Amino acid sequence: MSVTHGKMGLSLTQEILSHLGLANKTAAWGTLGTLRTFLSFSADKDVQRLLKAIAGQGVDRIAILDVLTNRSREQRQLISRAFHERTQQDLLKSLQAALSGNLERIVVALLQPAAHLDARELRTALKGSGSAEDVALEILATRTPPQLQECLAVYKHNFQVDAAEDIKSETRGILRDLLLALAKGGREAYTGIIDYNLAAQDVQALKQAEGPSTERTWVLVFTQRNPEHLVRVLNQYQWYTGHGLEKTVRARFHGAACVALLNLASVIRNTPLYFADKLHQALQETEPNYQALMRILISRSETDLLSIRAEFRKKFGKSLYSSLQDAVKGDCRSALLALCRAEDL
């Protein structure tokens, strides 16, 4: 289809320039994560070091963190298996017995398979924490389709209920509809073909969906279209109306529904910036939100934490590493700094 111009379309040059941010460029070793596969990996040597760290009178926390924060998640799982084969004991339980507090929590998160950690966080968000529009949406909206499928399968196995059933019972209104649609994983795949007519149709549909009983349109567009298409819709909406879609959301919705839609728009526009904002918010609380810090740093350490660091530094004028140093105390700080990896000057 032809490229449109004027208010409803972005030029080809604008399209290209919008994708040139350094925060989105893969690092020299082929990943935007801070944590890579440890090349000199030996599960047996790591097991020996961990056994030594917990066998004496005092627990060697530095040694434990040095091993766990310098191995990929797959390598940590291999260490757990090797530990069990050698000792007939569970590594996770052994470390839990030796540690306590936030350090214990971060070690548990490091040793759990990603899907198990996501399932646990999703369950906590839906059952009693009042954070469905925040944590539940984070997990459902930012995981890849295979990651989401595995998370939901683990959720059903561990808690004997479908996540969809908990969403239905614990949320309501457009928030419930958004979470259910995201949990179905029905978002269209990006084909590489730009459909400018569909983008224009979606912009018009959202403009006309500002009255009552139009929530279904918002859910459909936000949860079914592929992210690349949605970025174009958000840009064209602003081009056409003179204001961002977020302004319309704030005027049209309230409470959890408003927060959920704003969060989803943030994920669509710039996922690393979305996580940078969440990390900054977690650090600004009177007591740092350790659960949020742990969840985000661990879950993004092998995917895009370098991009998140770049967005954090650009927006807040201070590196994520320095912010963690200033706000977090104790052994937990050492673990989070190890995942963050380095200062951004």
UniProtKB/Swiss-Prot annotation:
Keywords: Annexin, Receptor, Repeat. Annexin repeats lie at residues 41-112, 113-184, 197-266, 270-341. Pfam families: Annexin (PF00191). SMART domains: ANX. One of its GO terms (cellular component) is plasma membrane. GO terms for molecular function: calcium ion binding; calcium-dependent phospholipid binding; phosphatidylserine binding. May act as a low affinity receptor for acetylcholine. Belongs to the annexin family. PANTHER family: ANNEXIN, ANNEXIN A9. Homodimer. This is Annexin A9.
